[in-house]
Amino acid sequence: MANAGFQEKSEKVIETFDELFKDYDYIVAPSASCAAYVKVYYPKILEGKHECISSKKIMDVVEFLHDVLKVDHVPGKFPHVVSVHNSCHGVRELGLSSPSERHIKPFNKIIDLLNMVEGITIHEPERKDECCGFGGMFSIEEPAVSTRMGEDKIKRHMATGAEYVTGPDSSCLMHMAGIAKKENMPIKFIHVVQILAAGL
């Protein structure tokens, strides 16, 4: 609701979320865009009305595994070729990887974790941090543009030779998977945690 511009109408939902989760040490989300919205926008929406404690505690699952737990071993095997999807929110609001428009030392926390998986081959597509076209309400308000962006992104993932597209943003994966299914594009989609958990 807030993402669609109805910020005042979403205040009660945000306050309820905060009350439910504020006492936990960490709030871990399986979607980078959802985690980013809580972290970046919840405090702005509630500014001067309610202290949003949960926004300081939420993180994407990749952040949690990489930065908090500091995972250095994964027991699983995944003998497949994957192309990593770096979502807009993950890159630019959560810092999961280095954005191409900034001249900083390259890093990618998603790839750091995937490199621990036995048998995996990892690629990134050309224009690796360009949007897939989902963008929440954007995909509803501009479906033709959203679909075309998704098609272009999928084709670039496929050009890597990947069997799977993986990443930490459920909404991006869902968007691209829907387009690929509708258009019979021969590539699969899997959340990064499903790969990391393959040996559990």
Positions of predicted regions on the chain:
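Iron-sulfur cluster-binding electron-transfer modules in prokaryotic oxidoreductases
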Residues: 1-200
